Amino acid sequence: MRSVTNAFGNSGELNDQVDETGYRKFDIHEGILFCIELSETMFKESSDLEYKSPLLEILESLDELMSQLVITRPGTAIGCYFYYCNREDAKEGIYELFPLRDINATFMKKLNDLLEDLSSGRISLYDYFMFQQTGSEKQVRLSVLFTFMLDTFLEEIPGQKQLSNKRVFLFTDIDKPQEAQDIDERARLRRLTIDLFDNKVNFATFFIGYADKPFDNEFYSDILQLGSHTNENTGLDSEFDGPSTKPIDAKYIKSRILRKKEVKRIMFQCPLILDEKTNFIVGVKGYTMYTHEKAGVRYKLVYEHEDIRQEAYSKRKFLNPITGEDVTGKTVKVYPYGDLDINLSDSQDQIVMEAYTQKDAFLKIIGFRSSSKSIHYFNNIDKSSFIVPDEAKYEGSIRTLASLLKILRKKDKIAILWGKLKSNSHPSLYTLSPSSVKDYNEGFYLYRVPFLDEIRKFPSLLSYDDGSEHKLDYDNMKKVTQSIMGYFNLRDGYNPSDFKNPLLQKHYKVLHDYLLQIETTFDENETPNTKKDRMMREDDSLRKLYYIRNKILESEKSEDPIIQRLNKYVKIWNMFYKKFNDDNISIKEEKKPFDKKPKFNI
């Protein structure tokens, strides 16, 4: 049966809208609403935050989030609101730092100026928000806040696309608001929660707890997890379980904000045909695993018209090469066949295409094979996709693909697929490989298999060292490398997003400083140590390498024999490397030139 989803689950699902005839494509336009409840403890310095207040940590995290989104997703809308605020420009106790609009330089500058004023001591958070601890009669009721959230998301903004993914980042450290003991008010909040759910608004909660004051999430779990229920027809749990109302420590505020910003971008949706004869079909959708942002590729062409900047658009024309006449409306598509040109109508062209493939995107299983015989490094010619079930059109897809995942894992096999991911592309071969048991992601990886003409042969070498002469040395080098790696552990695994692209960061820092009017000074007489510190601040990869280098150098001076081994292992590794490198050079020097045939002058 069709799975019941709710708006408090995975944010990527909000874009999976499907009509009755087929899959529909949507451009993701995400809106993030920061809602922060002010309290006495929000202004107090915390040792977990290097003696910063949680409120300042939230503001700095918001500034960093906007700096990242303007690079990766500049079309994202962000709004920031504080409730329980006594400022004169606050409406019903809700103060708007900036409204829910697409990221722009004006809002970024306003936030940046506020942070500069706070760091220089020109103003304090207490003074800026005019916060005064008063009784509950001044506190903003959650029903007013929830209604305000809904109205904000439903507001139509001229010149701004409709939001397809709506999220609320809710920050509070008050676990017992005034509504907690009011049964009628709780019921009203549940009804408002249903309204938010119906309008596809989901929550990312940041319930902040402290060592001396842990956060009790009973109240918020009661009102926010209302959308989680069981599918009565199948007895299966809902695909999503509502928002996480688990409290967090103050020190995790920034990392969680930057992690929660991620949205799952659907790359494609299509049916997966398991058996064409019996019409056994399930729905799947694919996500992009990684994207690589590049500097200087995002720009627009504009022109000035009556002192107003307008965006310029390109248009293609077809011209007669002799007369220069515009023949765009007279062109037709023909297929050359010998000395004839065959002109087919759209319907006839469709019939020809359907003779060898389907019109819409599809994937069809044509067989199974051992993983060891199918997954090869030289077949890696395209980006892989992560495949998960899609219950939107084909009910029972989750249960079916879960069984397929278990069987493929048990038999150590992969599925061979034939199909295409876009309606206007040509069919290709694919391998559908299950994720490993240790893998954090549970699903399938889809790899395109190249055709023969897409595989390039390795060049023939005049001299090639197969390593047989150094087999023992290679084995020893591997053991030494394993010992060295034992001293350096990635606690949370390798996450590419944790290592920023220095070229990309430099490009956008120049734009950022220019728009926000931030003065930058460059000392021509910069000392080597100062230059090194500056480079490590700008490049976190260099900073990590510098840390590893220092750890190796410090191990040589250590009195602990176990720590001293690290430096000894590195010296042995360098010895092997130098030996292999010298042998390779000697092989090249011994290479004899070809014997040239004598030339005869006639």
Curated annotation (Swiss-Prot):
GO terms for biological process: chromatin organization; double-strand break repair via break-induced replication; double-strand break repair via homologous recombination; double-strand break repair via nonhomologous end joining; establishment of protein-containing complex localization to telomere; mitochondrial double-strand break repair via homologous recombination; recombinational repair; silent mating-type cassette heterochromatin formation. GO terms for molecular function: ATP binding; ATP hydrolysis activity; damaged DNA binding; DNA helicase activity; telomerase RNA binding; telomeric DNA binding. Keywords: ATP-binding, Chromosome, DNA damage, DNA recombination, DNA repair, DNA-binding, Helicase, Hydrolase, Nucleotide-binding, Nucleus, Phosphoprotein, Telomere, Ubl conjugation. It is an enzyme of class 3 (hydrolase). Sumoylated by MMS21. Pfam families: Ku, Ku_C, Ku_N. Heterodimer of YKU70/HDF1 and YKU80/HDF2. This is ATP-dependent DNA helicase II subunit 1. It comes from Saccharomyces cerevisiae (strain ATCC 204508 / S288c). The gene is YKU70.
